[in-house]
Amino acid sequence: LEFRRVLFRSKKCPARQENGRKKKGEKGMIRAGIIGSTGYAGGELVRILLGHKDVEIKWYGSRSYIDKKYASVYQNMFQLVDDVCKDDNMEQLAKEVDVIFTATPQGLCASLVNDEILSKVKVIDLSADFRIKDVKTYEEWYKIEHKSPQYIDEAVYGLCEINREKVKQARIVANPGCYPTCSTLSIYPLLKEDLIDGNTIIIDAKSGTSGAGRGAKVDNLYCEVNENIKAYG
């Protein structure tokens, strides 16, 4: 810990000061709020946004760590993030930011979003709530009722390499999952240029346990996954 303190003090966080990064509160900064900032996806999102010269994170939401310093949860954020974690009050958050990211389990974003919120901010959801256009398929797969089916049609699948212009205009962006992203980006250019036969495609994709989230589960224990592989689908 002492070594890390010396390291950060000597370098003074160059990644956040170079490349023309604006100062906190400076005009033109995009104010972002994150609900679910302490999960694995949320933590990675924080890291990426902290390195963006035009973004300022105003809200670190976490049900599990309300009023605790974010850097006490992710110690690699020591001297980078001084904020404490807040709740998931999306209506209040919409009054304070320009864009809301939800890095939460399936069902939460759909239960929180409403017309008033969408009139104020853009919502980028990292869960599956708005990826699947067929409500019945979503409910069968995730075993939950979809709370906001009225927004599914307008949600844009946020694969920016393909839907860049639509993402810019969308009120709700459904961030793609890991398997569809790696599969689509690999295959799309080949199909677009008619270089392969779509009927011959076989996708063999594997994920580490971080893809299952940060919550404790027997299936994700070290003794269960070490030197092991489990098929699912």
Residue ranges and their predicted role:
Residues 1-7:
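Short, small-residue-biased leader/transition segments that mark boundaries at the very start
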Residues 13-16, 21-233:
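N-terminal Rossmann-like NAD(P) cofactor-binding subdomain of oxidoreductases
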